[in-house]
Swiss-Prot record:
Keyword Heme among UniProt keywords: no
Cofactor(s) needed by this chain: FMN
Coiled-coil intervals, chain numbering: none
Co-factor binding comment: Binds 1 FMN per subunit.
Protein name stated in the entry: Pyridoxamine 5'-phosphate oxidase YLR456W homolog
Cellular component terms per the entry's GO annotation: cytoplasm; nucleus
Origin: domain of life: Eukaryota
Keyword tags: Cytoplasm, Flavoprotein, FMN, Nucleus
Keyword Transmembrane included in the entry's annotation: no
SUPFAM superfamilies documented for this protein: FMN-binding split barrel (SSF50475)
Alphabetical list of InterPro entries matching this protein: PMP_oxidase-like (IPR052841), Split_barrel_FMN-bd (IPR012349)
Binding residues annotated for FMN, in chain numbering: F65, T66, N127
Localization of this protein: Cytoplasm; Nucleus
Amino acid sequence: MKLNEQIPKDLLRLIKSSKYVHVATCSSNCIPSVSLMHYIFVSSAETFHKHEYSIEIDCNDYIIFTVFEKSVTFRNVMSNPNVALLFHDWITAKNLTLRKKSVHSKDDFSFVESESTKFNNFLRDLNQSELNQVSATINGIADIVNPNSEESTYYRRLLLTVNPDADIFILGEDTAIIKVNIQKIKVSDMENNTSTYGQTVQPV
């Protein structure tokens, strides 16, 4: 699915700019699992084949992330490639930022207490104007990229560029690249209005 031709610009901006995505998978015997992942959005113009001398034409956009090969998510994708991804940038990052105290400070405990109180007060006073109105759920088909391939190296490099703080998850041993082909997007707002983009497909 090529998103920029089918969904509103604000929705595309949310998918491109969110820091994390909730990834829902299900085992072959229907046991669900959810994980929070660093990810990147890769447009059809940025996919690996566009940078190689390939005659194949791929007009799809993808969500790319890494998983550990011993994880439940990896095992689930191997047995059941149908996944759901939740994007919900529910609050601006600056409102969640708490300043760190210097490690040389003598009143560490009082600092933690005051910052904790500040954060609790912030959550208590949170109002609707500080919340984004839209969340998006993507249904897609996940594919495990060969970890020894040039494609895997290419996507790891992109992931690391966008998420330099997640190098242990991107470059760690026994990790694999997961590439999700987007099939359908369902958008919901605070008033329970919903819109659907893409076509419903039969599960793999």
